[in-house]
Amino acid sequence: MRNRPLTFLGADGSRLSARLAVPPDGRVEACALFAHCFTCSKDLKAAVNVSRALTQRRIAVFRFDFTGLGESEGDFAETNFSSNIDDLVAAADYMERELSAPAMLVGHSLGGAAVLRAADRIPSARAVATIGAPFDPEHVTNLFGDRLEEIEGEGETEVVLAGRRFTVTRQFVRDLAGHEMGEAIGRLGRPLLIFHSPVDRQVGIANAAKIYEAARHPKSFVSLDQADHLLLEERDSLFVGSVLGAWARRYVDAPVVEETPDELRAGDRVAARTGTERFRTEIV
């Protein structure tokens, strides 16, 4: 897998950092847009491993840091779930202009909820996949514990998530509550693949059941037995990427173009064609 660094303008004009993962030989049949988990980054090992597995299926993967996170510009305190959705749409627009429009959307954790909401604004996407996604974005507030009252009363507070400090604002929390996911999932209108671990301690398996129930067919569920929420074990993220790649080929594969007899003869080649009846081989 090769990673090509890129930058593009997010929804608020901030310059966002991205990576385009492509197969070693550069041959790409489709592109996927990947949304990372809450307060994570495009360089999370799980995201990289999923990308590596997809490139083996000739699916390029565009990963980026949301505004205010990772190597991207902007202030995290001024962002929210709605701005994440807008950043995804901005990324898809950039891909369509400069690379290739995303044929598949993939989201991890809150990024999974974001791709479910963004899908109706990204018409090129023919399939959607979520990994450990919450049914309701407001589920994220469980991470703030008893600081929620302080956020509501004071307007903002600093919380520690995975050893890092983030300023969480009242507008961020209120925005999480303003999204009706059931209707959005019901009108997705695309094949959906849901990955979730039955032992996920951050986003319980009941969330996957609700997403599955709200979605229409074709929809599929894959249980990530014994996996943690962040897919810290390499085998888990590689498994997700491998299964996702096989599933995606059904929906985003490039059309097969058969060579004509004249094209087969070109370049000093000899080709044989077998018929469908009797035992006959034709040298063309």
Regions found by a protein language model. Name each.
Residues 1-26:
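N-terminal cap/lid segment of alpha/beta-hydrolase-fold proteins
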Residues 39-51, 66, 206:
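The serine-hydrolase catalytic nucleophile loop
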Residues 51-73:
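Conserved alpha/beta-hydrolase
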Residues 78-98:
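Alpha/beta-hydrolase active-site loop
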Residues 123-171:
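Hydrolase active-site cap/lid region
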Residues 188-189, 194-196, 200:
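Short beta-strand/loop motif that positions the catalytic acidic residue
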Residues 227-239:
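Catalytic histidine-centered segment of alpha/beta-hydrolase-like enzymes
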Residues 247-284:
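Extended beta-strand/beta-hairpin segments
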